[in-house]
Regions:
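Functionally critical loop-and-helix segments that line ligand-binding/catalytic clefts
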Residues: 1-25, 151-198
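Short amphipathic alpha-helical surface micro-motifs
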Residues: 80-82, 142-145, 166-171
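A structural signal for isolated positions on well-ordered beta-strands in alpha/beta enzyme cores
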Residues: 61, 133-135, 161, 186
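Short secondary-structure transition/capping segments
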Residues: 106-117, 139-149, 178-196
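Glycine-rich, charge-decorated loop segments at or immediately adjacent to ligand/cofactor-binding or catalytic sites
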Residues: 71-77, 142-154
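Aromatic-lined carbohydrate-recognition surfaces of secreted/lumenal glycan-active proteins
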Residues: 127-145
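Short beta-alpha junction loops
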Residues: 68, 103, 140-142, 167
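Substrate-binding cleft of extracellular glycoside hydrolase catalytic domains
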Residues: 2-132
Length: 198
């Protein structure tokens, strides 16, 4: 999925193993599918979710849930694993591939801004070298307080996938007046409950 394939302000969804294998969401133009976590987990539904997204006309992309914290070597290893699985599962080169950097489930965001940023940049470089468009995903608080987004976007351009919710609960449409004011945003996740899908 390249920026030229999905127009600005298009809707998309992200799915993981706890969602259905049928990726058919009304109004969505793309789907970002969890592929891996760490270097030994593969989403058991990823293959079917990617095929379903394609069959329903959604452009598929992928992400891996980080377990690397602030370790550059682990970030590279996790990104290499994700790139290999993205290729094997049929995510087209040029599509987005994201490093999902959050607190919990084996990952810490508390390793210091410089070290965290070094790890993220190492992962994004592996993703880019693998033929994918790199993204880093997190909530706006983590992006602003635990990473140097200035360094990241200087090297990788518009590469942030930011979660920032105006309200909790079901949201059918984005309120673009609430859009997070930060540079480098490629994708804005405005809800965790899109049209009743969560």
């Amino acid at each position: 999925m390249s920026n030229s394939n999905v127009s600005s302000k298009s809707y998309g969804v992200d799915v993981a193993s706890y969602q259905s294998t049928s990726v058919n969401y009304t109004g969505a133009k793309f789907a970002i599918i969890k592929l891996t976590q760490g270097t030994d987990y593969l989403n058991p539904k990823a293959d079917q979710q990617i095929k379903s997204a394609k069959a329903h006309g959604l452009l598929p992309a992928g992400y891996f849930y980080a377990n690397h914290s602030n370790s550059v070597s682990r970030a590279r290893s996790e990104a290499k694993y994700a790139v290999a699985k993205a290729k094997a599962l049929g995510i087209p080169e040029g599509s987005y591939l994201a490093d999902d950097f959050e607190q919990g489930s084996g990952n810490s965001v508390n390793g210091g801004v410089q070290a965290n940023t070094d790890a993220i940049m190492a992962a994004l470089q592996v993703i880019k070298d693998g033929g994918y468009q790199p993204l880093v995903y997190s909530g706006s608080f983590v992006l602003r307080n635990h990473l140097s987004i200035t360094r990241i976007i200087k090297s990788f351009g518009t590469c942030l996938w930011v979660a920032s919710y105006k309200v909790s609960g079901r949201q059918d449409y984005a309120d673009f007046n609430y859009f997070p004011s930060m540079d480098g945003v490629a994708i804005w996740q405005f809800t965790d409950n899109y049209k009743g899908y969560n």
